[in-house]
Amino acid sequence: CALSYVAVGLTAFDAIVHAFTTVSTGGFSNYDSSFGHFSGAVEYVAIIFMIMAALPFVRYVQLVNGNSRAIISDTQIKTFLITTLLVATFVFFVLNNLFPGDWESALRKSLFNITSIISGTGYSSDNYMAWGGMLVSVIFFIGLIGGCAGSTTCSVKVFRYQLVASAILLQLRKIRYPH
């Protein structure tokens, strides 16, 4: 992670500080403006490593031990990635309509900030309050999701939401087909 940050222009000190807080999903920065202080390339690197930090560590162990399907076959990971992508896409379209003309910036800001919030990392690259009440509400609610169980992320975790959804579906089937 630190080497990737250096490759896109961070100093060694900034790269190490931000690598530690990205991989641990700790999210603190040595700058008041957090990732708003850096160029867009740094945000893309952070997106990749925040996603990696939000995945279950046991899947990485399985991957290293030769199970190449460990990550792609996990429903929790699929749910996390799809949720992140869907919410970031929604935020992108809203941002692109609010601030037309710079679609790359809208895409980067939506991916970075949504990944940061859903993973619990807490970095920011923009002032969310300028995005309007609807997107602030979206950010609040995705913060309640969190990453995958078995990762360093905070919040409820995707796995627990999957368990609740399964239990609800099971009960609904029992109500509909009692015998």
Q: Would you name each region that the model predicts?
A:
Residues 1-179:
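Membrane-proximal intracellular helices of multi-pass ion channels
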